């Protein structure tokens, strides 16, 4: 994986997020709890999941990276963003996953075939656990248990 590939995906997600509400489609679905939801809200949440996932892939390889947020830069635009710290990146990823959890679909979905290609609440929770465990690991935290940073304990409690 090279540096630019994840940012290309992040840019495409930002383009989708900036334009999805312009497209008029009123498709709804019924979630596992019987609530009626708008499909475009789930699509936005799934796109934000992908953005969080690709930021995590960048952070695993490079440590802190520039965070673009929702901004859509033009392809020929000169972008000079400061590199965010590792902690800022982890907080951004976790906040993205926390923000989308209520808009993602929950298992089981009515159509088993459709379930294979849907980012659901459980996937977001699993990624959040992985991010927090990675952040609390000795690779980035010399004393993961003794330091009291809460990362290890928070990740361990996520399964509840």
Q: Which residues make up each language-model segment?
A:
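Well-ordered alpha-helical segments within folded domains of soluble proteins
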Residues: 9-10, 14, 125-132
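Conserved, well-structured interaction surfaces
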Residues: 1-62, 78-91, 95-116
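Internal, well-ordered domain-core segments that constitute the primary functional module
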Residues: 98, 127-133, 143-147, 153
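Structural register within alpha-helical repeat arrays
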Residues: 44, 51, 58, 121, ...
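Short coil/linker segments at helix-helix boundaries
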Residues: 27-37, 64-83, 139-160
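Short, small-residue-rich loop/turn micro-motifs
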Residues: 21, 63, 69-73, 97, ...
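Aromatic-lined, polymer-binding surfaces characteristic
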Residues: 64-66, 114-126
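Short coil/turn linking the two alpha-helices of tandem helical-hairpin repeats
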Residues: 57-66, 108, 131-143
